[in-house]
């Protein structure tokens, strides 16, 4: 289902632990990492889609998480043409997403990447809140930055991205 501008309605999910680190999933048989996300079915609310995708991709139920916040508006990204299925070329532009920020209230061991027969991830880790912006595939970078920035206001004690970058160092310990 595409909107009239060629964007597929979708939800993005940012799961935080008590240290404000975010769940970062490694895509099956790939070397790329991303947040859980997925399409909204016709007649489904963004919140219902988020809970369905949360179970399908991460194996977490509503009782394992608490919604902390969500983006006010749809955030969009365009998918490069060479990534678009041939039958969708010409009509499909990308995804429009409502992003949810969740707090994991369960345990790390509640995460189950094999909750369905078609897993999206084959590995995961906790990552610094701002780190995904630098490590996600380039065409999603801007939407990740918009989502993380908008939702950061819900987290106490989280450094701004600028403050986080100011203290960043290279692998050899030299300032960036």
Curated annotation (Swiss-Prot):
Coiled coil: none annotated. A motif (Nudix box) lies at residues 38-59. CDD domains: NUDIX_Ap4A_hydrolase_plant_like (cd03671). GO terms for molecular function: pyrophosphatase activity. It holds the Pfam family NUDIX. Keywords: Hydrolase. NCBIfam families: PRK00714.1-2 (NF001935), PRK00714.1-4 (NF001937), PRK00714.1-5 (NF001938). InterPro entries: Nudix_hydrolase (IPR020476), NUDIX_hydrolase-like_dom_sf (IPR015797), NUDIX_hydrolase_CS (IPR020084), NUDIX_hydrolase_dom (IPR000086), RppH (IPR022927). Belongs to the Nudix hydrolase family. RppH subfamily. This is RNA pyrophosphohydrolase. HAMAP family: Nudix_RppH. Accelerates the degradation of transcripts by removing pyrophosphate from the 5'-end of triphosphorylated RNA, leading to a more labile monophosphorylated state that can stimulate subsequent ribonuclease cleavage. Residues 6-149 form the Nudix hydrolase domain. Its EC number is 3.6.1.-. It is an enzyme of class 3 (hydrolase). Its cofactor is a divalent metal cation.
């Amino acid at each position: 289902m595409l909107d009239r501008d060629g964007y597929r309605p979708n939800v993005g999910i940012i799961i935080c632990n008590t240290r404000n680190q975010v769940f970062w999933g490694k895509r099956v048989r790939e070397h790329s990492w991303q947040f859980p996300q997925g399409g909204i079915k016709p007649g489904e609310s963004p919140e219902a889609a988020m809970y369905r995708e949360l179970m399908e991709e991460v194996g977490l139920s509503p009782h394992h998480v608490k919604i902390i916040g969500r983006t006010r508006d749809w955030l969009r990204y365009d998918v490069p043409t060479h990534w678009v299925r041939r039958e969708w070329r010409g009509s499909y532009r990308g995804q429009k997403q409502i992003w949810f920020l969740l707090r994991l209230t369960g345990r790390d061991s509640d995460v189950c990447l094999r909750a369905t027969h078609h897993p999206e991830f084959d590995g995961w880790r906790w990552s610094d809140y701002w780190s995904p912006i630098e490590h996600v595939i380039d065409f999603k970078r801007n939407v990740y930055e918009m989502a993380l920035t908008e939702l950061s206001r819900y987290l106490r004690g989280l450094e701004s991205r600028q403050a986080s970058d100011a203290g960043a160092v290279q692998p050899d310990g030299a300032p960036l």
